[in-house]
Amino acid sequence: MLAKVTFLSCITMSDFTFSGYELACFVTHSGLSRSAGHILSQCANLAATTSEYFIHKPHRLIAAETGYSQSTVVRAFREAVNKGILSVEIVIGDHRERRANLYRFTPSFLAFAQQAKNALIESKLKISSAATKVKAVLAKTLALFNFLSTPPCQNDTPSPCQDDVAIKNKKSQVKKTKRSVSGGAGTTSLKKLTSWIAKAKAKADNLRLSKKRTQKHEFKQKVEAAARKYAYLKNKRSPDIGGISNFDNLPHCMTVNEALNAVLAKNKDNEQWGIPAGFRG
């Protein structure tokens, strides 16, 4: 029998990459009750927009969005926290008033989700594949995990409440402790939380922009390589190309604009062969 996975080493939050749809599916099949799974899966779409995977929204708004009562929503989040799927931090406003709690998907749950995603890929399945097959794969993966016994992994961006750590004074050692609250939840100020969320969103935007630039650069290289190859073959008299794959410095090569215009002259699809903005032409 396979042993449960109870330890993760050298894993950071940036190692996990899920779409909202994927994360929602893994939450649904994480062993929660039906109502709790449905409520948290609705929140997972927004949580997956940053690499911090957090939920910060009042219970009453979540209840209105999901169609459940507020008490059911509270029980759902409490169940997820008790099972180690979510961690909770109490948010205190500027006037010491309670604000909406900050929930984060735990590294142990995200590790389960990543392993489940890999298992689906190995089984040549997608989230949208037959539900019976997907459930079987996720159930096998879930059996290997114990969210509560898995120690936390190193976060790329510390949680707001992690600012309240032990400090040493030159004259005497003073330990700064977090406020004691029921359930052992940490506390953080609304000001710190707002700054932390802004950084998380900015980081996510930069990652998306970087990914978009990389894809555009790769696409540009493919188009230019295809255009150079077309231009060379069009002007080459000998049918034997001898396995040539790089057409950068060959004679009779036209520019990308000239090569693609030649293709357009043969009534090819204009949208397919058009030159994207910023390309050499």
Curated annotation (Swiss-Prot):
<protein>
    <recommendedName>
        <fullName>Replication protein repL</fullName>
    </recommendedName>
</protein>
<comment type="function">
    <text>Essential for L-replicon function. Necessary for initiation of DNA replication from the L-replicon at oriL.</text>
</comment>
<dbReference type="GO" id="GO:0006260">
    <property type="term" value="P:DNA replication"/>
</dbReference>
<keyword id="KW-0235">DNA replication</keyword>
